Amino acid sequence: MRAPVLKELDLPQYKQSLRKAVKFLNELEYTAVKTKYNAKGNWDAVSIRGYSDDITNILKPGVLKSNVKVEPLRWTRLYEEPDLLPLKEILSHIPAEFERVRVMRLKAGTTIKKHTDKVDKAIKDGKIVRLHIPIKTSMNV
């Protein structure tokens, strides 16, 4: 049986300031996202949950010939970071089991073309969903 595809989640609006979280995130060292859609290096990320304790290890085993070992999924130190408590609170309202959770940055004035992550085949049957939660954005997005 095919699972229904949700287009919108009824989540409470987060009204607290994210300034501390943004400041903390801006001070981290990010890793460039490995994809042909990032040829100019304008897109990077850190891991909050993934296959490693290393926040710069943002890939999934088997993606783009990565050497990421198949390890149990785990939360990185960022999940318990006090300045990122708002992110933890936002995630707590999402009724799902998480695989990877990443904070991604896109340099101002750049865009990413529409694409899919071919390795996540379970997206088609609704077993995996991708959510994008803007922390800092512009009115043009």
Regions found by a protein language model. Name each.
Residues 87-141:
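Catalytic core of non-heme Fe(II) oxygenases with the double-stranded beta-helix
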